């Protein structure tokens, strides 16, 4: 029976590479997949799933007016799986449409994304995935500054931590780091970051 999965993790926890791996495994068995990603994320171009280790793949971009259920039904209602990257950028209606893909088309949907933003608040997509998903799994990584598990995302600008501002900001001079709670509130100064990086 198909289910809606939400796999979340801090920055650098391997979410995008996991999507590429899952897609490869299905396709190696001649099973078709539909890969979706947020149209907001244009770091490597719109409609690209890109991992930090350099692997990339085209995907269908999701915009505010995209209906995920209709998109899947029109693209391939017999797909073996739907994979969604950057799912934190989904809106409530997208998550409900993804759940409908699971319930009405019996296609598993695996959504991958951040749970919380740099202010340590839930993204809209993450909030509704936490509410509607059948299975929720944390993808783990370690803090940029120590060996503890990273559970937060720290935004830095010119060597200083940023705790206010727009939730979604693609590009710019900001850098994001996966961090533990201690280093979220007390990050090392810029010189130490440069030594670590």
UniProtKB/Swiss-Prot annotation:
Catalysed conversion reaction: thymidine + ATP = dTMP + ADP + H(+)
Subcellular localization(s) per the UniProt record: Cytoplasm
Highest taxon of the lineage: Bacteria
A Pfam family this chain is assigned to: TK
GO biological process, one term: DNA biosynthetic process
Residues the record marks as active site: 86 (proton acceptor)
Record-listed E.C. numbers: 2.7.1.21
Positions contributing to Zn(2+) binding: 143, 146, 180, 183
A cellular component term, taken from the record's GO annotations: cytosol
UniProt keyword list: ATP-binding, Cytoplasm, DNA synthesis, Kinase, Metal-binding, Nucleotide-binding, Transferase, Zinc
Gene Ontology terms, MF aspect: ATP binding; thymidine kinase activity; zinc ion binding
Signal peptide region: none
Principal subcellular localization: cytoplasm
Enzyme class of the recorded protein, top EC level: transferase
Stored SUPFAM superfamilies: Glucocorticoid receptor-like (DNA-binding domain), P-loop containing nucleoside triphosphate hydrolases
Keyword Zinc-finger: no
InterPro entries noted in UniProt: P-loop_NTPase (IPR027417), Thymidine_kinase (IPR001267), Thymidine_kinase_CS (IPR020633)
Residues that hold ATP according to the record: 9-16, 85-88
PANTHER family documented for this protein: THYMIDINE KINASE, THYMIDINE KINASE, CYTOSOLIC
Subunit (UniProt): Homotetramer.
Family affiliation: Belongs to the thymidine kinase family.
Descriptive protein name: Thymidine kinase
Gene: tdk
